[in-house]
Amino acid sequence: MAFTLYALIQTAILFTNAIAVLHEERFLSKIGWGAEQGVGGFGDDPGIKAQLLNLIRSVRTVMRVPLIAVNSVCIVLLLLFG
């Protein structure tokens, strides 16, 4: 298998899918990354953990519908071109 642009795009899609399917109550809260975790006071810089939680929530919110379309296109391309 060659290292192609399509392989890089497919890798990015797989990572985005992995982030999008993380469930807060079933997975993230068990490792201490649930929604009830505090993010600090006003004026404090949020830590790495708070920023990662914000990234995960943002990806789950914003990328839900586009991921369906991108996954469908990838499936069709794989069916057509192998």
Curated annotation (Swiss-Prot):
This protein's record includes keyword Transmembrane: yes
Q: Which InterPro entries does the entry mention?
A: Yos1
User: Which BP terms in the Gene Ontology apply to this protein?
Assistant: brain development; endoplasmic reticulum to Golgi vesicle-mediated transport; organ growth; positive regulation of extracellular matrix constituent secretion; positive regulation of protein secretion; protein transport
Pfam families tied to this protein: Yos1
The job of this chain, per UniProt, is described as:
Regulator of endoplasmic reticulum secretion that acts as a key determinant of brain size. Required for secretion of extracellular matrix proteins. Required for correct brain development by depositing sufficient extracellular matrix proteins for tissue integrity and the proliferation of neural progenitors. Acts as a regulator of the unfolded protein response (UPR).
Q: Report the PANTHER family cross-referenced here.
A: IMMEDIATE EARLY RESPONSE 3-INTERACTING PROTEIN 1 (PTHR15858:SF0)
Q: What is this protein called?
A: Immediate early response 3-interacting protein 1
- Tell me the gene name: ier3ip1
